[in-house]
């Protein structure tokens, strides 16, 4: 079973966007383009991650594999529900 001490950061630019990195390596190996879009990482927590650890929106095995391969795992925000997007597209003229 693979286990890794991970540090999790949230993005100040987008709600519900998180960056998982190896605690030992930190942010030193992050691509500049990623950090530019992500913003200044805000530390959230440190977590001992193993393949059987349940996560809310990702499989722990996928997170561990991505950290091993590229040094990080980027968790994107969930897709917005289409009915919520329609509220912004609907014309508002004549409603008030």
UniProtKB/Swiss-Prot annotation:
The protein depicted here goes by the name YcgL domain-containing protein Csal_1462
Q: Classify the source by domain of life.
A: Bacteria
> What HAMAP family does the record point to?
UPF0745
Residues in the signal sequence: none
Any idea where the YcgL domain is? 4-88
Species whose genome carries this gene? Chromohalobacter salexigens (strain ATCC BAA-138 / DSM 3043 / CIP 106854 / NCIMB 13768 / 1H11)
The record's listing under InterPro entries reads: YcgL-like_sf, YcgL_dom
User: Gene3D superfamilies annotated for this entry?
Assistant: YcgL domain (3.10.510.20)
Any Pfam family matching the protein: YcgL
Q: Which SUPFAM superfamilies match?
A: YcgL-like (SSF160191)
The lineage is: Bacteria, Pseudomonadati, Pseudomonadota, Gammaproteobacteria, Oceanospirillales
């Amino acid at each position: 079973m693979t286990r890794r001490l991970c540090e999790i950061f949230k993005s100040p630019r987008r709600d519900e966007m998180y960056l998982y990195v190896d605690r030992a390596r930190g942010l030193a190996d992050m691509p500049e383009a990623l950090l530019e879009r992500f913003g200044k990482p805000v530390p959230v927590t440190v977590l001992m991650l193993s393949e059987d650890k349940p996560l809310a929106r990702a499989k722990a095995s996928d997170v561990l594999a991505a950290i091993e391969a590229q040094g990080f795992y980027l968790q994107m925000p969930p897709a917005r529900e289409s009915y919520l997007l329609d509220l912004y597209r609907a014309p508002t003229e004549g409603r008030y």
